[in-house]
Each structure stands twice: as structure tokens, then as C-alpha cells.
Amino acid sequence: MAAKIKRGDTVVVISGREKGKRGEVERVLPRENRVVVKGVNTRTRHARPSQQNPDGLYRFDAPIHISNVMLVDPNTGEPTRVGYRFTESGQKVRVAKRSGKDIDG
């Protein structure tokens, strides 16, 4: 499945425990169909305390499935599905289905 969400996009979580949260995509894992969203699905690992990490806690954002997020239309600020179209110069650009406007430049 082609990932229509790219790194740097703003997305909203549409299902699960984190439903309704918005964040920026940090990583896209296309083989696993997952994305890492900043501030969403935060996990904590316990490690031995050290001088660099005195409390021994390591927090990170775990990946969530790509079907659980929806791109936020940069023009309207609302969640939207994504389509593609070709420009006159033959360049493929992403299009917000809700507003019909280009997402990529």
C-alpha cells in the first residue's frame, strides 16, 4: 500500500486510545504500514539510572498503524482523505479530497 502520508505532515488520530490528538509525523515505516507521530503513543522504558539519565526512564513515541491517522488539510485545518493528480508539467502532487486543493506546493 502506498503511504500517502509523508514525514513532516500534520495528522490527527482517528481511532484508538489517542483518538483526537494531532501531531507531526516524525517517521514513516512503509513496510510495516506504520507512522511515528510526535507526542502520540508515548511509551516508557526502564533502564539502569546513569549520570546522563538519573531517573532511569526512557520515553519515546511508538509507531501506530497508518490506517489510524488521517492527514490534516493545510488549507482548512480539517482531517481529509488524500488523492493524487498530475500537474500540467507532469508532476504528481497530493490533493486533499475534502477541499480539492493541492497539499504539496
Curated annotation (Swiss-Prot):
Keywords for this protein: Ribonucleoprotein, Ribosomal protein, RNA-binding, rRNA-binding
One Gene Ontology MF term: structural constituent of ribosome
Signal sequence interval, chain numbering: none
Pfam families documented for this protein: KOW, ribosomal_L24
NCBIfam families: rplX_bact
Assembly behavior: Part of the 50S ribosomal subunit.
Stated role: One of two assembly initiator proteins, it binds directly to the 5'-end of the 23S rRNA, where it nucleates assembly of the 50S subunit. One of the proteins that surrounds the polypeptide exit tunnel on the outside of the subunit.
Name of the protein in question: Large ribosomal subunit protein uL24
Top-level taxonomy: Bacteria, Bacillati, Actinomycetota, Rubrobacteria, Rubrobacterales
Gene designation: rplX
